[in-house]
């Protein structure tokens, strides 16, 4: 499956699964659909066995986008595809937030914002101690959670320990539940902040497949001494025109007719 097709898969299945659940985080998923699609299009070192010890790890610090991750894990065969139809149902392993104890391919249970980078630091340090020289730990962050002080404690720790096997990706969509980051509390300049903590930083268009894949391929070896940060400039709700730049769809539910129309637009845009 091509890279763009994976991003479209994430969006289509997010709409379908939220229709099953009754509500969910459409626009937060849509802003990082290309980013998640890229990670599962050859960027991460993963295998058929989701428990392979030397695999890359992915921490969804913005755990409320798990509904977009599940179709990618099912596509890889980590769990049966019919699990998707049970999303958020009583007894289902697939909840609003990812559960590492119940879902193959999930590397850490997340949900409360601000914790993911600290977890990533611990995993990157553990990989070094175990001699997993090619293992990289990826952390997908939302921009508004950068207001959590724990993020910057982790950023300082990563630099101090020389964790060149850690890469943070910031989904900089500039919008959260309460409004834009400028209205609530600015987190800019994101790149300069990470650089001040000793990270290598690059900014790119988070909806440009070529830019994402090119930058991922250009990352320094995991044996390096500087952690990496990719600031991905994205649009909240990207892929469905009436959701773009609207906080209305941070969490919500589409009627069946609106859901069908959204899927048509996703397919047309590719």
Please provide the spans of the model-predicted regions:
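Cofactor-binding active-site loop characterized by glycine-rich and histidine/acidic residues
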Residues: 14-17, 29-160
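N-terminal capping segment at the start of a domain
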Residues: 7-23, 171-173
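Thiamine diphosphate
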Residues: 105, 109-222
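Short secondary-structure boundary/capping segments
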Residues: 76, 184, 244-248
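Glycine/aspartate-rich loop-and-adjacent alpha/beta segment that forms the canonical ThDP
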Residues: 209, 213-270
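Flexible, glycine/charged-enriched surface loops at secondary-structure junctions
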Residues: 26, 84, 227-229
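Short, small-residue-biased leader/transition segments that mark boundaries at the very start
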Residues: 1-2
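Glycine-rich beta-alpha junction loops
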Residues: 34, 64-65, 69, 173-174, ...
